[in-house]
Structures are given as structure tokens and as C-alpha cells.
Amino acid sequence: MSAQLLEGKVVAAAVLEDVARRVAVLKDKGISPGLGTILVGDDGPSVSYVNKKRETCKQVGIASFHNEIPASATQSDLLAAVRDFNDSPDVDAYIIQYPLPKGFDFNEALNLMLPEKDADGLHPVNLGRLVLQEPGPVPCTPAGIRAMLQHYDIAIEGKEVVVIGRGPTLGRPLSLLLTLKQPYANAAVTVVHSGIKDLGAYTRRADIVIAAAGCPGIVQPDMIRPGAVVISGGISWEGRKLLPDVDEAVGEVAGWITPRLGGVGPTTVAMLLLNTVQAAEERARRAGKL
């Protein structure tokens, strides 16, 4: 068996087409959506990711604002950058690129952010809204994974889903998202992690396995039921080499799988811009222009 590919680039293109259309509508009404980025230090993968976000903003017509802070700066400098974007009328939403260098407190900066300007959907208020099924920005990688399953019309309701990873940016919010009583959710979700000795005892019974651990090769072929859906959401870096959570040979067992490149990453960026245009639409509604 050779698995069919879940092409994140295809899913992202469809999302970005919708974003570009909505941006054009807003601009016709005098509203120009803007996305801000706070980057601390010069970590290679972070710089590449931020550059990709900027390129995609340009593609769909979203203005891009940047605040680059040297790693030698202080926590006070980071908090000042957050306040600047909070106060800026041109920035509808923004991100604090994670991870931060040692010595910086991400949670303190995140809590200072205005929840309505949280492009990543990670502010405690917005995670609470996700729990309560209230409107708000959804964390981008979980939202992108759900959009991918929806795009390929892969049934989730009532299915057994195993999420490997419990981090605040992917594993935990994804497990919440997939248990909501909504279309393309309402699944039976089990959350496991790298501290469990026999992960295969959980994954072999799953219809869908989503790896979000950031542990290279944590998912091996003998851990997957033939025909299952396998999504690699967690990554690690060895220098500039990307190492996915899912071993390449899993593609010989799975029914569907994300490719090594062009899987979840493009959908994450697309959902970031979707959150941004939704924030701009809310600004337009407050101004009576939408």
C-alpha cells in the first residue's frame, strides 16, 4: 500500500483564495488589514517562518508590520513591542514568534497582548473561548489540520483519534478542537505523549493519528493500523534540516499521510492570515462599515 497525500499546499491555496477575496471587500470599504510580527533574535527556522508569513501577506494583500528585537534585548523591550502593536490602529492582529531566546518570558508577553489582536489564537482568553465554543481566533496549526481533513472529506465524527503531544500550541488545543460538537469534529480523542512507554498500544487502534510531539520518528510503521490517516504536525530541527515526527516508511502502511514537505506548514500560515482578516472584519463591523 502507498498512502494518498494530504497536500497542505492545496488546502492553503483554497484558504488564501478566500482570504484574498475578503481582503478586497474590506479595502473597498476603506479597511486595510494588517498583521504584525514580533521576532526576538535570529533563530534560523524562526526567521524563515516569519519571512514566509510576510511573503504570504503580500500575496493576499494584507499589510505586514515587523518589530525585530535583538536577542541581547530585555523582557521590558519585548513588552514594549507588545504595547506598540496593541496601540497601533494599523495592526489588526499580530504574533510573538515562538520559541523565544533564553531569558524571555513568552507567557508574560502573551498575557499582555489584547485578545482580539491574537493572530495565533493562543491567548488564555481565546483558549477559553475554544473550550466554551465561543467565537474567537483558533490556534493556527490545529485549525489548519482540521481544514485539511475537511478539504479531503475525511470523516472525523465518531472516529478514534490519537494525538501524540500535549503542548499548548498544538496537542492540547487540537484535542479540544476535534471534540467540539461540530462538523468535522465530534471525535473520540485520546491524548498521549512521549513519556508513555508503548505508544503503539494506543495508535494501532486509531482511525486518525496526529503526531504533535516534536520528537523525530516517534511514529513508526508498526504503530499504525493499515489504512489509517496519519498527520505529522510536530517537527524538530537538526541545524537547518527539518525532522518530522512521522517516519517516512509509515506511508507504506497508512491510507492517507502528510508529505515530508508541504504538509501542515502551509495550512498553519494560511490560518494565521484567516485569523487576521477575521480581526479586520471585526474592526470594520465596529466602525459600521461591514
Swiss-Prot record:
Keyword Transport in annotation: no
UniProt-annotated binding residues for NADP(+): G165, R166, G167, S194, I235
Superkingdom of source: Bacteria
GO biological processes: L-histidine biosynthetic process; methionine biosynthetic process; purine nucleotide biosynthetic process; tetrahydrofolate interconversion
Pfam families to which the protein is assigned, alphabetical: THF_DHG_CYH, THF_DHG_CYH_C
GO function terms (MF aspect): methenyltetrahydrofolate cyclohydrolase activity; methylenetetrahydrofolate dehydrogenase (NADP+) activity
Swiss-Prot/TrEMBL keywords: Amino-acid biosynthesis, Histidine biosynthesis, Hydrolase, Methionine biosynthesis, Multifunctional enzyme, NADP, One-carbon metabolism, Oxidoreductase, Purine biosynthesis
Reactions catalysed according to its record: (6R)-5,10-methylene-5,6,7,8-tetrahydrofolate + NADP(+) = (6R)-5,10-methenyltetrahydrofolate + NADPH; (6R)-5,10-methenyltetrahydrofolate + H2O = (6R)-10-formyltetrahydrofolate + H(+)
EC number of this enzyme: 1.5.1.5, 3.5.4.9
UniProt pathway annotation: One-carbon metabolism; tetrahydrofolate interconversion
GO CC terms, sorted: cytosol
Keyword Kinase: no
Subunit structure of this chain's protein: Homodimer.
Protein purpose: Catalyzes the oxidation of 5,10-methylenetetrahydrofolate to 5,10-methenyltetrahydrofolate and then the hydrolysis of 5,10-methenyltetrahydrofolate to 10-formyltetrahydrofolate.
Family statement: Belongs to the tetrahydrofolate dehydrogenase/cyclohydrolase family.
UniProt protein name: Bifunctional protein FolD
